[in-house]
A protein has these predicted regions:
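A membrane-topology feature that recognizes alpha-helical transmembrane segments
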Residues: 1-92, 97-194
């Protein structure tokens, strides 16, 4: 419980700073990473020497693993590495890399990667909603139809005009999608709905 509440508070701060200033600050992510490792280290010690059934619901370390500390570090490394590849390949910011590495440290490998995928799906959906909001559904459908007609006429990929490309250069806000993604994965929100 403590781990999930702390993670959601950190994500709330990251969401605010990302939307307001387009930055996810180190003072949010680094202490979060350390807190995740500390909580999971306590979980490892309690599993070895203490009353795990009493303390796991309170602290909320990574469940169902023999060594929560190792799971935390593995999640941190894996999620951070995947996002580092995205940083090099795509236009993902460094704050997003650290944010998702922090998620991996809190959630472990499996839940961290699933949360990251949910964030990308929700971020893409949010981007599409913003695109429709800015351009309008009718105008967007006309532009897509015109582009598809050009592609079919040429028989190969046709570059978008600069005017249309400008709409696609919107930033991908991952921090705002992190909260619903964590709720979906950690608390099983979709399980409640279906």
């Amino acid at each position: 419980m403590l781990a999930t509440v702390l993670l959601l508070l950190l994500l709330l701060v990251a969401t605010f700073t990302d939307v307001r200033w387009h930055k996810i600050y180190n003072w949010t992510t680094y202490p979060g990473m350390l807190a995740a490792v500390a909580i999971n280290a306590c979980g490892t010690l309690i599993l070895a020497y203490g009353d795990a059934q009493r303390w796991q619901p309170v602290l909320g370390w990574i469940p169902d693993v023999p060594n929560p500390l190792a799971a935390s570090i593995l999640g941190w490394l894996a999620c951070g590495f995947v996002m580092l590849l995205c940083l090099v390949t795509f236009q993902i910011g460094g704050g997003d890399v650290k944010l998702i590495a922090m998620l991996g440290a809190f959630l472990g490998l499996e839940q961290g990667l699933v949360t990251m995928l949910w964030m990308l799906v929700l971020g893409g959906a949010l981007g599409l909603v913003l695109l429709i909001w800015q351009v309008g559904i009718g105008r967007l459908l006309v532009k897509v139809g015109r582009h598809l007609k050009n592609v079919l006429k040429l028989g190969r990929h046709a570059p978008l005009p600069e005017e249309d490309r400008a709409y696609l250069q919107q930033p991908l806000y991952l921090a705002p999608t992190s909260i619903p993604a964590v709720l979906i994965v950690r608390l099983g929100v979709l399980d409640w709905l279906f």
